[in-house]
Amino acid sequence: MATYVKTANKGEVRVLFSVPKRYFRKAVDRNRYKRLLRESYRLNKETVTTAITDKDFGLDIALTATSNQKPTFRRIETVMIAILKGIIYEEDN
């Protein structure tokens, strides 16, 4: 699940990763999920940062895990790409 808010910081994108204890009881599993989320964002952040650089606002994005299935990098990356493209699409229109 992704939530974002426009901020006054021009062209700045900040991201929050959250994995609730409700879905993953062990800290090892939560940390792995967050690590995969961070890596996926790192590899795909260029799409959102290039779209926001010339705008007069910034974005704060919160990504929260809402599934209790064990994550795979491929699944997380496809969802991450879809989320980032969706945010860009909503802000352009």
Where do the language-model regions lie?
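Positively charged, solvent-exposed patches that mediate nucleic-acid binding
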Residues: M1-N93
